[in-house]
Amino acid sequence: MIRALEAVIISTDNAAKLAEFYREKVGLKQTEEMEIGDKGEKGFDFDINGTGLYILDHSDIKGKNSHGARVMFNLEVDDIEKEFERLKKEDVKVVQETYHVEEYGLIATFEDPDGNYFQFVQVRAN
């Protein structure tokens, strides 16, 4: 039986740079920095209410993701308009401005420096 989503992993050729983006611009709290293997590769852990977001160096990854929408993750926020404006001020690339999905809520889509997409969501009150 599957109990939960434990973590999401983003592999990159520059984990330090990508971790800085998620820490400094997106505002996630970094909980750990680690060295992986014997090649000096780095890893960074961000805890999002019990689910890990790991950003890891990977020797097989080179350059930007050419299909950023293939896999996305959503970060739930309390005030999507406020958070949207905050990221715009941080010069985070906007893929899709805030829009409404009936029976779900509001969504805004952004792109990180590696070309991966992530979304802010404000779900409707239950």
Regions found by a protein language model. Give the residues of each.
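Conserved beta-strand in the GNAT
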Residues: 54-56, 119
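Core segments of cupin and vicinal oxygen chelate
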Residues: 9-52
